[in-house]
From Swiss-Prot:
One example of a Gene Ontology biological process annotation: mitochondrial electron transport, cytochrome c to oxygen
Organism listed in the record: Pithecia pithecia
InterPro entries: Cyt_c_oxidase_su4 (IPR013288), Cyt_c_oxidase_su4_fam (IPR004203), Cyt_c_oxidase_su4_sf (IPR036639)
UniProt similarity note: Belongs to the cytochrome c oxidase IV family.
Membrane topology term: Single-pass membrane protein
Protein name per UniProt: Cytochrome c oxidase subunit 4 isoform 1, mitochondrial
Taxonomic path: Eukaryota, Metazoa, Chordata, Craniata, Vertebrata
This protein's encoding gene: COX4I1
Pathway linked to the protein: Energy metabolism; oxidative phosphorylation
Length: 144
């Protein structure tokens, strides 16, 4: 009885730019036409047509360097998913602003901010290098 090795114990074929010549051929089990072509390969290569040379290349390698270096379209999926999540987040924020959050407090009104700024100036808050240091108390205007 002969022990047969399993496929996972054999070397595997991988197309890689940094390892251009894999240890095994791309096609492991040749068809009858491929076997005939491999026999024809042993003779002079000048007798082979261009299509036969390409077929021999495809038996040995899955992709050429140009095909390996070709860019993928994965970026479209990534950009599409990012735009979907950004749009979903924007819709969620708009719905929260409309239905969850209440109105802004009165302290955000321009009149209230002006009154608070005037009060801080009257109290001379941080007179050394803060808000009060930028106010001219004699002319009642901001320093230039």
């Amino acid at each position: 009885s002969v022990v047969k090795s399993e496929d996972y114990t054999l070397q595997s074929y991988v197309d890689r730019r940094d390892y251009p010549l894999p240890d095994v051929a791309h096609v492991r089990h040749l068809s009858a036409s491929q076997k005939a072509l491999k026999e024809k390969e042993k003779a002079s290569w000048s007798s082979l047509s261009m299509d036969e040379k390409v077929e021999l290349y495809r038996i040995q390698f899955k992709e050429s360097f140009a095909e390996m270096n070709r860019g993928s379209n994965e970026w479209k999926t990534v950009v599409g998913a990012a735009m979907f999540f950004i749009g979903f987040t924007a819709i969620l924020i708009m719905l929260e602003k409309r239905y969850v959050y209440g109105p802004l407090p009165h302290t955000f009104d321009k009149e209230w901010v002006a009154m608070q700024t005037k009060r801080m100036l009257d109290l001379k808050v941080n007179p050394v290098d803060g808000l009060a240091s930028k106010w001219d108390y004699e002319k009642k205007e901001w320093k230039k």
